[in-house]
Amino acid sequence: MSLPNPADLIRQMAVDLRAHLARRGITEPRYIGIRTGGVWVAQALQQELGDTSPLGTLDVSFYRDDFSQNGLHPQVRPSELPFEVEGQHLVLIDDVLMSGRTIRAALNELFDYGRPASVTLVCLLDLDAGELPIRPNVLGATLSLAAHERVKLTGPAPLALERQDLATASAL
């Protein structure tokens, strides 16, 4: 199975997001990308939409519920939200939805900043391996992978997807 082209997915996601926001009457959404791949997708999506509003970024490392098991990511950076969260319509963007734990962590962090009017979830890929009841409002594609496979977004320019085989990596 070949992996989809992120640029093609983002073009369709822009169409779908525009329609989703219009149906809900949202005219001034605030975009937030989850580091690192979600920020790249958010930048590409904003460019496709022609939206030049400031982009917020979240690093959810301290909010993850598996922090004690996996430890701290070596490149933790502060979150940056150049706008108020309280009462805003947020578009939360990530690259790959797998367990749902990153999104849960992002929502927890966002609510520490205030109570948004709404949160629209946008994901480039859903790996259909959810452990939590989290589903994107706008999705590029769903992939079904073997238990030992993962997909990684590389970028930021150009964005590309690469398949990783954990069985091969652990054998090295």
UniProtKB/Swiss-Prot annotation:
SUPFAM superfamilies, from UniProt? PRTase-like
Q: What is this protein called?
A: Bifunctional protein PyrR
Q: Which InterPro entries match?
A: PRibTrfase_dom, PRTase-like, PyrR, PyrR_bifunctional
| UniProt key word Transferase | yes
| EC number of the protein | 2.4.2.9
Kindly state which keywords UniProt assigns to this record, in alphabetical order: Glycosyltransferase, Transcription, Transcription regulation, Transferase
The top EC class, named as a word, is transferase
Q: Name one GO molecular function term.
A: uracil phosphoribosyltransferase activity
UniProt xrefs under NCBIfam families: PRK05205.1-1 (NF003545)
Q: What does this protein do?
A: Regulates the transcription of the pyrimidine nucleotide (pyr) operon in response to exogenous pyrimidines. Also displays a weak uracil phosphoribosyltransferase activity which is not physiologically significant.
